[in-house]
């Protein structure tokens, strides 16, 4: 999915605020995904799935850090996430259907925490960005 110049502007504007609290926002998105879609817990057999779990927060930070890194390479998201794509496809073998589920929950968390900044243009841009990241992360499955 091609990101327009306007999309890139909105992504660049909101990602630093998200990244500043990656453990909180990423953890909340993962927690929501685990509650709403329990089958996604399969890949985390040793996790404590309670709200504000340190394990979920730590993994949430990894997710947000990866998204922040991708946001610094909006013209080459595939290149910047190639190693992560390999990891998820070949080593972890994560169900590719989980990425859109997490993307949806990230949008929910961002909307809740940044209601003024999460206008329709930012919503569209972040949705396109997360869809692109999901596509990149599943590209090695084929």
UniProtKB/Swiss-Prot annotation:
Cellular component terms (Gene Ontology): blood microparticle; haptoglobin-hemoglobin complex; hemoglobin complex
Reported tissue expression: Red blood cells.
InterPro entries noted in UniProt: Globin, Globin-like_sf, Globin/Proto, Hemoglobin_a-typ, Hemoglobin_oxygen_transport
Sequence ranges assigned to domain Globin in this UniProt record: 2-142
Annotated keywords: Heme, Iron, Metal-binding, Oxygen transport, Transport
Entry GO MF terms: haptoglobin binding; heme binding; metal ion binding; organic acid binding; oxygen binding; oxygen carrier activity; peroxidase activity
Swiss-Prot/TrEMBL GO biological process terms: hydrogen peroxide catabolic process
Residues binding heme b: 88
Binding site for O2: 59
CDD domains, alphabetized: Hb-alpha-like
Family label: Belongs to the globin family.
Function: Involved in oxygen transport from the lung to the various peripheral tissues.
Assembly with partners or alone: Heterotetramer of two alpha chains and two beta chains.
PANTHER family the record matches: HEMOGLOBIN FAMILY MEMBER, HEMOGLOBIN SUBUNIT ALPHA
Name under which the protein is recorded: Hemoglobin subunit alpha-1
Native source organism of the sequence: Xenopus laevis
Name of encoding gene: hba1
